[in-house]
């Protein structure tokens, strides 16, 4: 949720943020109205309760002659208090809905517009000239790494098996990411992949894209699409100690996405699937440290991409392509030879205080006063990386060179039929 103090003092900035996202700026006015109505309802209920308390004291001190009239007055006040409290509850519900409807305020400098309005920040490496390149699925099937046919037989479309050295390749990626994370002060966490509705909502995943999330209706639980979700809930309703610096966690989990809005997109191979593994970095810090932590997360992602030796670019994602929680997001996109374009391998988001405010995660400032923490997240490795590795390192004979950093995990320098 956005900061109400900031909203009241800077409504035009929030309206501008909404416009840059392609979202309705009128939601800002709806929230301001709901905020004013809620405060008025609280004040009215408080005043009536004070009157009721004073009237009760008068009844206790009244003479027999005065008591009947005072009792009648007290009864009337009790009814008024009941009505005022009901009005306050209604105002609270309206306010909460209006508050939840507004996305995080984008950071100055984020490109306005939709998916194609990103800014390229850096391009690393030159794509190899590959004559008649094979795609990752053709390579993966020929080398015994990926089995989509049996995945579909067992679970349906967009499911797969990783087999033999394909499984080792993914495990190697994950272990490289874990090593990089723990070497840089992250605590490794293997979290639950099922979470309660309030945790999913707290991270911002039950908004406009709620249909992308798997829900177990009989248990009222959600399967996570990223370990960002359980890691954001890890310190919910807590005051954490940030006096020694940010708290950094690396979550390794399976992830699940319905891909409900992706009909007909990336239907071949493992670019867009319902289940995959991922190592996700997650950081709690003071708000003033968030921008620097965002740059550090991006730096660690770039270290990982250097280890798999693929050409990539870094983009500043446009406001209209941000999730509701993110105030800024950087993507690293690897070159995919058969598509002749760059595809996302990592993203890292600065969520400022948006998630922590919803989840009530705070820290104490230098005066001991509780303040809302900032949160950030970023991909350190995921199954999709196999696409970039297989396609960029393919050889004319149909084999694939294994990046040097992954050789110890895979057990060979070349994947051959």
From Swiss-Prot:
PROSITE patterns, sorted: AA_TRNA_LIGASE_II
Sequence positions that bind ATP: 257-259, 273, 344-347
Catalysed reaction, written as an equation: tRNA(Ser) + L-serine + ATP = L-seryl-tRNA(Ser) + AMP + diphosphate + H(+); tRNA(Sec) + L-serine + ATP = L-seryl-tRNA(Sec) + AMP + diphosphate + H(+)
GO MF terms held by the record: ATP binding; serine-tRNA ligase activity
Residues bound to L-serine: 226-228, 280, 379
Its EC number(s): 6.1.1.11
Pathway listed: Aminoacyl-tRNA biosynthesis; selenocysteinyl-tRNA(Sec) biosynthesis; L-seryl-tRNA(Sec) from L-serine and tRNA(Sec): step 1/1
Coiled coil: none
Any one of the GO CC terms: cytoplasm
Protein's UniProt keywords contain Amino-acid biosynthesis: no
Keywords assigned by UniProt, alphabetized: Aminoacyl-tRNA synthetase, ATP-binding, Cytoplasm, Ligase, Nucleotide-binding, Protein biosynthesis
Pfam families: Seryl_tRNA_N, tRNA-synt_2b
Alphabetical list of InterPro entries matching this protein: aa-tRNA-synt_IIb, aa-tRNA-synth_II, aa-tRNA-synth_II/BPL/LPL, Ser-tRNA-ligase_type_1, Ser-tRNA-synth_1_N, SerRS_1_N_sf, SerRS_core, tRNA-bd_arm
Cellular localization per UniProt: Cytoplasm
CDD domains to which the protein is assigned, alphabetical: SerRS_core
One GO BP annotation of this record: selenocysteine biosynthetic process
Quaternary structure (record): Homodimer. The tRNA molecule binds across the dimer.
UniProt cross-references to HAMAP family, sorted A to Z: Ser_tRNA_synth_type1
Family according to the record: Belongs to the class-II aminoacyl-tRNA synthetase family. Type-1 seryl-tRNA synthetase subfamily.
Domain free text: Consists of two distinct domains, a catalytic core and a N-terminal extension that is involved in tRNA binding.
Function description: Catalyzes the attachment of serine to tRNA(Ser). Is also able to aminoacylate tRNA(Sec) with serine, to form the misacylated tRNA L-seryl-tRNA(Sec), which will be further converted into selenocysteinyl-tRNA(Sec).
Protein name: Serine--tRNA ligase
Organism: Mycobacterium sp. (strain KMS)
Protein's gene: serS
């Amino acid at each position: 949720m956005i900061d109400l103090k900031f909203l009241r003092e800077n409504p035009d900035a929030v309206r501008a943020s909404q416009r840059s996202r392609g979202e309705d700026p009128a939601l800002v006015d709806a929230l301001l109205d709901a905020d004013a109505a809620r405060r008025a309802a609280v004040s009215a209920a408080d005043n009536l309760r004070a009157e009721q308390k004073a009237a009760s004291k008068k009844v206790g001190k009244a003479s027999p002659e005065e008591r009947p009239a005072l009792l009648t007055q007290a009864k009337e006040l009790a009814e008024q208090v009941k009505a005022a409290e009901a009005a306050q509850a209604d105002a609270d519900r309206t306010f909460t809905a209006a508050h939840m409807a507004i996305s995080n305020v984008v950071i100055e400098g984020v490109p306005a517009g939709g998916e194609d309005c990103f800014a390229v920040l850096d391009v690393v490496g030159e794509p190899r000239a590959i004559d008649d390149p094979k795609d990752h699925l053709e390579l993966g099937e020929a080398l015994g790494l990926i089995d989509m046919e049996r995945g579909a037989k067992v679970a349906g479309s967009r499911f797969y098996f990783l087999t033999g050295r394909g499984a080792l390749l993914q495990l190697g990626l994950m272990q490289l990411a874990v090593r990089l994370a723990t070497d840089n002060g992250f605590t490794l966490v293997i979290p639950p992949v099922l979470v309660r509705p309030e945790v999913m909502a707290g991270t911002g995943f039950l908004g406009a894209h709620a249909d992308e999330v798997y829900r177990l209706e009989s248990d009222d639980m959600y399967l996570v699409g990223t370990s960002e979700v359980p890691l954001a809930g890890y310190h919910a309703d807590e005051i954490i100690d940030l006096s020694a610096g940010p708290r950094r966690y690396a979550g390794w989990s399976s992830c699940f996405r319905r891909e409900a809005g992706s009909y007909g997109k990336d239907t071949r191979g493992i670019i867009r699937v319902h289940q995959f593994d991922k190592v996700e970095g997650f950081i709690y810090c003071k708000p003033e440290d968030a921008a620097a932590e965002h740059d550090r997360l991006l730096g660690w992602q770039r270290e990982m991409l250097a280890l798999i030796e693929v050409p990539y670019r870094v983009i500043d994602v446009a406001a209209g392509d941000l999730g509701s929680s993110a105030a800024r997001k950087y993507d690293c996109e690897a070159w995919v030879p058969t598509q002749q374009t760059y595809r996302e391998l990592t993203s890292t988001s600065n969520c400022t205080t948006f998630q922590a405010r919803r989840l009530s995660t705070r820290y104490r400032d230098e005066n001991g006063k509780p303040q809302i923490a900032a949160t950030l997240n970023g991909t350190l490795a995921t199954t999709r990386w196999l696409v970039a590795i297989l396609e960029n390192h393919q050889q004319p004979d149909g084999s694939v060179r294994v990046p040097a950093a992954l050789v110890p995990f895979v057990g060979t320098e070349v994947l051959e039929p």
